[in-house]
Regions:
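N-terminal export/assembly segments and adjacent metallocofactor-ligating motifs
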Residues: 1-221, 255, 418-421
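Non-catalytic alpha/beta scaffold blocks inside enzyme catalytic domains
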Residues: 127-280, 313-421
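Flexible, glycine/charged-enriched surface loops at secondary-structure junctions
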Residues: 279-287
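Short, solvent-exposed aromatic-acidic interface loops
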Residues: 42-43, 287-289
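Active-site loop ensemble at the mouth of alpha/beta enzyme cores that anchors a bound cofactor
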Residues: 296-314
């Protein structure tokens, strides 16, 4: 028989890229005769790399139990049996969309599972700061139309959001003059600033750390508040003047780049923003929660009132931002089974463990040697879906590039739920 492509929807004018925090919708995807997916429109290396991991040809990946190919029914039954025998499951990875997150929450409630994302520590950084002191947020639209001063904390945010400055209109006529500052940048950031400098109306500046990032942020906060600082660096004094004179200043950072106890840095920036808002306008945007983790946290919050690192246990709903850290639970032997979800990026694989493990995700994760493996469709590639954007204020629809032969995660999880006693 001649192998045929699954029904392709390439060339549609609407395609939302699910592979970074910005959820850009300015490109389309083309499917060639070999089934390869290529990006057309706005170029993005991140999206192109991700698309190379997919094909419009029917996948050969099959469910597995203990490394042996089986039917979906058999894999679902094995997963349900494993979870039923577990006294404390951990749901990790959490690379999925809204419908997958809703199904995960239902299964977590039934099994008493603790849920934490693959980069849970980075996700908790801003959450803990908000829980302790409150936060100031903004949106990409606000930054695009109003911000005349953008301060990047700990480097530019191009690792997780490659097109950040383009999405924010830096160099466009919406804001005639913008100044971009990087505090504690690297050589990569110098290259980004050099490129920004060539855009109309854009000036740039790089400020080295004064000791470490904690000290630098604390010094900046004190200067903005008008407190005396002995031997304050000239560069920070100049930045304070710019902040006070700006029409709308925005601090931007990637939480995964922050050191341990990074919530203190976020609190310091929030304190600075609060002081500035007494006389002008300022806000902060912390980028994190990629691969669907931010979306899952949003969904868990609206369903239960609690974010990730929570569980529905014998004492009711419990939230422990420190004790329910997945890495800590694994290291201390506090859980006895692992369900790992990674539908967007096969490189986000489950940690090495001797625990019974269920893996639901990209077909390439078949090599993870899980007790149970079920390949599922990726939202925005083989199936539709929804994700929250980086700023957390907008949920965007994802459109399928082709009709997948793999099941959606939500349907697999619902079948496991029905089969779990």
């Amino acid at each position: 028989m001649t192998e045929t492509l699954v029904t392709a929807r390439a060339g549609a004018t609407r395609w939302t890229c699910p592979f970074c925090l910005l959820l850009c919708d300015t490109s389309t995807v083309q499917v060639d005769a070999s089934g390869a997916l290529t990006l057309s429109g706005t170029g993005c290396a991140c999206a192109s790399r991700a698309l190379a991991r997919f094909s419009a040809r029917p996948t050969t990946a099959s469910p597995q139990v203990d490394g042996q190919v089986c039917t979906l029914d058999q894999a679902v039954a094995a997963a349900a049996k494993l979870l039923a025998a577990s006294r404390q499951p951990l749901f990790g990875g959490l690379g999925t969309d809204v419908s997958g997150a809703r199904a995960l929450y239902r299964l977590a409630c039934k099994t008493g599972a603790i849920s934490d994302a693959a980069e849970g520590a980075a996700l908790m950084t801003t959450l803990r700061a908000t829980q302790d002191r409150g936060s100031f947020f903004t949106t990409l639209a606000e930054v695009r139309t109003r911000a005349d001063l953008i301060v990047c904390v700990g480097g530019t945010p191009v690792e997780q959001a490659p097109g950040f400055f383009e999405r924010c209109g830096v160099g466009e006529e919406l804001v005639a003059k913008r100044h971009v500052v990087v505090i504690g940048g690297s050589g990569v950031d110098d290259a980004v600033l050099a490129a920004l400098r060539t855009r109309p109306g854009v000036t740039v500046e790089s400020i080295p750390l004064q000791g470490d990032l904690f000290t630098t942020v604390a010094t900046l906060s004190a200067l903005v508040a008008g407190r005396a600082v002995r031997e304050a660096p000239t560069a920070l004094k100049s930045l304070v003047t710019r902040l006070q004179q700006a029409r709308y200043a925005v601090f931007v950072g990637e939480t995964r780049k922050l050191p341990a106890q990074g919530a203190l840095i976020v609190e310091g920036i929030n304190r600075t923003v609060g002081t500035l808002n007494q006389t002008t306008r300022a806000a902060a945007m912390w980028l994190g929660g990629g691969n669907g983790a931010g979306t899952v946290s949003q969904v868990f919050t609206w369903l239960s009132g609690l974010p990730l690192r929570s569980r529905a246990g014998p004492l009711g709903l419990e939230h422990e931002p420190l004790c329910f850290d997945a890495q800590r639970l694994l290291a201390e032997g506090a859980i006895d089974s692992l369900l790992w979800v990674s539908g967007f990026d096969p490189d986000v694989a489950p940690p090495a463990t001797v625990l019974p493990t269920i893996v639901l995700g990209h077909p390439d994760l078949a090599s993870a040697r899980a007790s149970v493996f079920i390949p599922v469709s990726t939202p925005g590639i083989g199936s539709p879906g929804h994700l929250f954007r980086a700023d957390g204020s907008v949920m965007l629809p994802l459109f399928a590039v082709y009709e997948d032969t793999l099941p959606m995660l939500s349907s697999v999880l619902d079948r496991i739920l029905e089969s779990t006693p």
